[in-house]
Amino acid sequence: MTKNNNRYHKNNRLLNGVIGLAVLIVFVCAIGQGNLRKEVHGQEQVRPEGGTSESINESPAPSYEIVDDSYFASSLLVGDSRAETLGLYSDLADWDVCATRNLDIEMVESSKIVDTGSGQMITVPDMLSKTNYNSIYISFGTGELGWYKERFITAYRTFLDKITALQPAADIYVMSILPVSAELSSEDSVYNNPAVDRFNLALQELCREYDNVKYLDIASSVAVDGVLPDDVGTDGIHFNKEYSQKIIDYIKNNV
């Protein structure tokens, strides 16, 4: 009995030693793994062995391929006098431009501004019911700065509802309202940059209501410190050929 008991105690000590070693290994591994993980603002992050933090949920920033002039062969530009200027100075021969002076977002559905080529004039919705486009650009807002914001957005939403129904496969871009010059903004109670900013913010919110409508911040391509530079044009509102090309380049890089 004594010899068996000694063997039993010896085996028991050996077993306890093995268990202790296993627990130690697990503990060391847990510490090492813990050093690779941390919480940042409530989000779990992984620290690679090199020591740089990297979010496990981080998604890459959106990237765009620069499009060439051929992209605009199936594009339509609709808008007011600023859109008309862009169409005139852009040197893009292939896109269709339906824009004219004094056209506003409430008038665009009913105004017959599209020449069919046979002498017949039709509305933009009539044309969209006959011709499919890959992309449609809309530019309104300068002439509507004196309106209540709610009136402007209601009319814009009505037009977007019509276009998205007629062209469900098209990418539709709502172009931001360009700022005016610092001098005009400081002197005019209607055409001023605080009003432009309010309307642009409302347009961004409107675009979020649609799956295939995107807000295109073309203002950032020409504005300097939030205003239209003095050398852009003569009236503080419209722009010249040089700045038309800046806008086109921005579009090519952001669609």
Where does each model-flagged region fall?
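N-terminal, intrinsically disordered, polar/charged segments of Gram-positive cell-envelope systems
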Residues: 34-74
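Active-site segments of SGNH/GDSL-like serine hydrolases
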Residues: 139, 143, 164-196
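Catalytic His-Asp segment of secreted/periplasmic serine-dependent ester chemistry enzymes
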Residues: 31, 180-255
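Conserved SGNH/GDSL esterase-like catalytic core that processes O-acyl groups on lipids
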Residues: 65-155
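Loop/turn elements at helix/coil->beta-strand transitions in domains of secreted/extracellular proteins
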Residues: 71-74, 131-136, 167-172, 210-214
